[in-house]
Amino acid sequence: MAFEDVAVYFSQEEWGLLDTAQRALYRRVMLDNFALVASLGLSTSRPRVVIQLERGEEPWVPSGTDTTLSRTTYRRRNPGSWSLTEDRDVSGEWPRAFPDTPPGMTTSVFPVAGACHSVKSLQRQRGASPSRERKPTGVSVIYWERLLLGSGSGQASVSLRLTSPLRPPEGVRLREKTLTEHALLGRQPRTPERQKPCAQEVPGRTFGSAQDLEAAGGRGHHRMGAVWQEPHRLLGGQEPSTWDELGEALHAGEKSFECRACSKVFVKSSDLLKHLRTHTGERPYECAQCGKAFSQTSHLTQHQRIHSGETPYACPVCGKAFRHSSSLVRHQRIHTAEKSFRCSECGKAFSHGSNLSQHRKIHAGGRPYACAQCGRRFCRNSHLIQHERTHTGEKPFVCALCGAAFSQGSSLFKHQRVHTGEKPFACPQCGRAFSHSSNLTQHQLLHTGERPFRCVDCGKAFAKGAVLLSHRRIHTGEKPFVCTQCGRAFRERPALFHHQRIHTGEKTVRRSRASLHPQARSVAGASSEGAPAKETEPTPASGPAAVSQPAEV
């Protein structure tokens, strides 16, 4: 066996049809095959294609070059089929070997170590005359293989079959796949007359494996199965009889690819191959900057935006940009106030499905995260971490402009709108804009007159939940705001701030009722028109006791 027996060559057009994974697989297999042949002493010179591959050059050959694809002779077994037997190079004898096949068709297979290698056995439709057997040109079979088999996934255990520049004839399709492909796709290959999966056509005998074939005097690199066949069944699902019907079946969402590990079903075999990596743990796509690996190229593309800082998805309303389109969709719900995820038990609505899932744990009693200091329980570990900062006083999120610190990143994000002046939440009725969505929600209650927050003790209703919370302290007697210097407690935070001025000595000016209410001030001014206004000056404070104190609410 010489290196040319397993070598594959491409024209520039054919090389351009391969994706990155296929090219890498081709380089690796070709170099491994040459190393194997050289180790056996069967190769004395370094072929040009090997030199090109070692230099990192593109190994395609000019169109029209008579290249040896494989030392194979094609012989007719019966009037209805063609088969392969290894003998010699027939690349120049193709028109004579296949008189009913258009010139220019090249068929090649390069094997992958450890796999039951695929066959390129050309079979005509039984009973069809050469004139009726049309093989339209213009589209590479690579396209159809990617459509049906999901080739190009980078799986090293799948044999890569290349046929160009022809596409499958009308009513004829690629029916059988390699044993490895069937194992990956979760099904056993269906062969005519129920022959064994790895059967090799040998006159008078059928072998169940490559080892049996080699023991019988055959060669270990024989190929199996048939490629051009009459329409049959694909992976257990009823297969359409034409390519048009096949396309309709794909668009109709017919699921026929099942994972043998978890029984999940897919419409496309390429989706199944991607899914199988979740079971095998394979991550063939590696980031060149940080070395992190991914199972899909799309995940690698998204990850690389972290290094480049690229944010291609911009919000048309506020201009904020995101790395992922899904993040933009979630963000746009802020502007539309859309809350399409509603709890079936309490009716509470959420803008994100993940928030609804966490909320449902409340009804199910699922609050697994408990605070070690106060015992309060939470649905999420992140909520517990945020809560613990109320005990420790930690504020790790600092504003770079003014130095204000916050315990939560979302609070810092909202605070930064004070500096930017951004008000992305606009009222659709009056056009007034707000910096926070909660402010917009409260504002819209003015238009509707709704007071959704009702006290269970006295029945009084409020437009704001915070006002209801403060009101509830009247019934409970709770005073959570405690002065750190004297220990006096208050129901509301503003009352505590007023009280703390006693200790700091800060002077306050008592404001009249007219100063608090502009309408009352205007009425007072009208009634005293023409009379000298009586000026009231604040009485100098003789001590802390003279400072006015607000009454407790």
Swiss-Prot record:
ZnF region ranges: C2H2-type: 257-279, 285-307, 313-335, 341-363, 369-391, 397-419, 425-447, 453-475, 481-503
UniProt keywords, alphabetically: DNA-binding, Metal-binding, Nucleus, Repeat, Transcription, Transcription regulation, Zinc, Zinc-finger
Protein name: Zinc finger protein 324A
Coiled coil region boundaries: none
Functional description taken from the UniProt entry: May be involved in transcriptional regulation. May be involved in regulation of cell proliferation.
Domain KRAB: 1-72
Family: Belongs to the krueppel C2H2-type zinc-finger protein family.
Pfam family, any one: zf-C2H2
Motif (Nuclear localization signal): 130-135
A GO BP entry: regulation of transcription by RNA polymerase II
Molecular-function GO term, any one: RNA polymerase II cis-regulatory region sequence-specific DNA binding
Gene3D superfamilies: 6.10.140.140, Classic Zinc Finger
An annotated GO cellular component: nucleus
Induction of its expression: Induced at the early stage of T cell activation. Regulated at the transcriptional level during the cell cycle. Induced at a maximum level in the S phase.
Keyword rRNA-binding: no
Matches recorded under CDD domains: KRAB_A-box (cd07765)
Domain of life from the UniProt record: Eukaryota
Tissue specificity note: Expressed at high levels in the spleen, thymus, and PBMC, at low levels in the prostate, ovary, small intestine, colon (mucosal lining), placenta, lung, and pancreas, and very weakly expressed in the liver and kidney.
Subcellular location per the Swiss-Prot or TrEMBL entry: Nucleus
This protein's record includes keyword Coiled coil: no
